[in-house]
């Protein structure tokens, strides 16, 4: 690890002891140096994990990993299960080609287990961890995640920020803060900014939890419509930049909603 050593000449120490102004200057200087050292240490730790081979990093996982090959695309899921899937509530399906339908998945499981490029954290504005999926991600990633988050200056509703994944199977975590209550524009921004950050960093596989539908009170079906419509628009405009978007679902009610709405937004037969 990089070590920082500061040598202070005797004449500066003498000035420091005599002047309150100089005291303030030195305190501010050392605080700045300390913050710089802290950021350098965080970056060093992040890069250590990012540069590991897959085999080496697997030794650091806190959970059994799920690979992208273990998750069916919506196209494959539909072809396998369409005889058993209800079509009663599907209005005005929006046709897409099979290639686009292969770029989305719905999956019930633990988002912290996904061995992909990035998982999205439904964070709070401090980025310092909380309950639900936020707390689960922080626990699985380890304490280095909180140290990096402390350098980011928080996050506003609808914005997104990126950190390393540390002990997670995912290489990166994209943190976004969902709205409290039903605010469609802000929820849409969460998905748009998260996808934009993924593409900016050449991350081709990404998983979303259901943002804002828990204690933040956004109705599940309304939130799912925004998620699917926003992801569909992004894929249509950037089909060559994203390989898979996974909607990670925890509740059976979420699975039922996505199974219904995927027939509308990603219909291909």
Question: Where are the regions a protein language model picked out?
Answer:
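Macrodomain-like recognition of ADP-ribose-binding/processing modules
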Residues: 2-269
């Amino acid at each position: 690890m990089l070590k920082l050593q500061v040598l202070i000449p005797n004449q500066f120490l003498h000035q420091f002891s005599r002047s309150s102004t100089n005291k303030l200057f030195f305190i501010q200087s050392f605080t700045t140096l300390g913050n710089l050292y802290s950021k350098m240490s965080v970056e060093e730790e992040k890069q250590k994990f990012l540069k590991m081979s897959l085999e080496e990093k697997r030794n650091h996982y806190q959970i059994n990993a799920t690979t992208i090959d273990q998750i069916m695309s919506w196209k494959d899921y539909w072809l396998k299960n369409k005889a058993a899937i209800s079509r009663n509530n599907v209005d005005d399906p929006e046709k897409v080609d099979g290639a686009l339908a292969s770029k989305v998945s719905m999956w019930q499981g633990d988002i912290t287990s996904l061995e992909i490029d990035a998982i999205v954290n439904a964070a709070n504005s401090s980025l310092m961890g909380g309950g639900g999926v936020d707390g689960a991600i922080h626990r699985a990633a380890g304490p280095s995640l909180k140290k990096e988050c402390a350098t980011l200056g928080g996050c506003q509703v609808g914005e997104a920020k990126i950190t390393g994944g540390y002990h997670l199977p995912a290489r990166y975590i994209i943190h976004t803060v969902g709205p409290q209550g039903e605010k469609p524009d802000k929820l849409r921004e969460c998905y748009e900014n998260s996808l934009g950050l993924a593409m900016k960093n050449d991350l081709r596989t990404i998983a979303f939890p259901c943002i804002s539908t828990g204690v933040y009170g956004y109705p599940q079906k309304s939130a799912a419509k925004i998620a699917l419509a926003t992801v569909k628009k992004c894929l249509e405009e950037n089909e060559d930049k994203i390989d898979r978007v996974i909607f990670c679902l925890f509740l059976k009610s979420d699975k039922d909603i996505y199974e219904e709405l995927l027939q509308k937004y990603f219909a291909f037969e």
